């Protein structure tokens, strides 16, 4: 289980940070968006698990390939939702801040990012679900360790009590991660409490 958590945590961390930066960049700059949009259209419809054989061939280790795919499955929804959040901000907010002498750095850090955070968390929830699926497939096919590998091993040896125990651990792990993300969201967005419907 610790191996699965480490693999998932590293991939989600990389995917979330890169997705947040990418979404913020294309939402703020039309020039950057011009070059990144084709990449989103190309990679968006492709399930990350479909790229597993290619990544296992390219990357020197199955661990690196799995981390990349987990990061990719998180990167796309976080990017799109962050971009949507930045683009959906009322332009009047920027105008008021500029009237008060706000710099571009202030507009990004104190206006754009806080206003886009609810969308960012929606992307995080979507990315976490997708990344968990990629984790299990990667452990079954490439990594050969962790919960996914144990589940496949138990099924192959007809050890059905072990298999159902692995499924229960998977369900509890996913539920715990989602609950933790809800707690983090409620803590960071306490100033919007009462205005969120999810």
Regions found by a protein language model. Name each.
Residues 81-123, 151:
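Short cytoplasmic-facing helical segments at TM-TM junctions of multi-pass membrane proteins
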Residues 56-57, 133-170, 189-198:
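Glycine-rich helix-loop "coupling/hinge" segments at transmembrane-helix boundaries
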Residues 41-77, 84-85:
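Generic hydrophobic transmembrane alpha-helix motif, especially the helices
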Residues 10-40:
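Transmembrane-helix boundary motif in ABC transporter permease subunits
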Residues 30, 87, 122, 164-198:
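C-terminal transmembrane helix and the adjacent membrane-cytosol boundary/short C-terminal tail
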Residues 2, 32-36, 64, 68-71, ...:
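Alpha-helical membrane-protein architecture signal
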């Amino acid at each position: 289980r610790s191996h699965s958590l480490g693999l998932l945590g590293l991939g989600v961390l990389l995917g979330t940070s890169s997705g947040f930066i990418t979404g913020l960049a294309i939402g703020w700059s039309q020039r950057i968006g011009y070059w990144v949009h084709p990449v989103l259209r190309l990679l968006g419809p492709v399930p990350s698990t479909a790229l597993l054989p290619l990544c296992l061939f390219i990357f020197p280790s199955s661990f690196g390939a799995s981390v990349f795919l987990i990061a990719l499955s998180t990167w796309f929804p976080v990017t799109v939702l962050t971009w949507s959040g930045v683009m959906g901000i009322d332009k009047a907010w920027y105008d008021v801040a500029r009237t008060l002498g706000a710099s571009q750095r202030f507009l990004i850090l104190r206006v754009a990012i806080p206003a886009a955070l609810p969308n960012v968390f929606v992307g995080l929830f979507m990315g976490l679900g997708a990344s968990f699926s990629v984790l299990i497939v990667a452990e079954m096919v490439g990594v050969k360790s962790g919960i996914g590998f144990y589940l496949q091993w138990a099924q192959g040896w007809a050890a059905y009590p072990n298999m159902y125990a692995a499924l229960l651990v998977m369900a509890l792990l996913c539920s715990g991660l989602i609950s933790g993300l809800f707690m983090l969201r409620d803590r960071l967005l306490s100033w919007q409490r009462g205005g969120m419907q999810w």
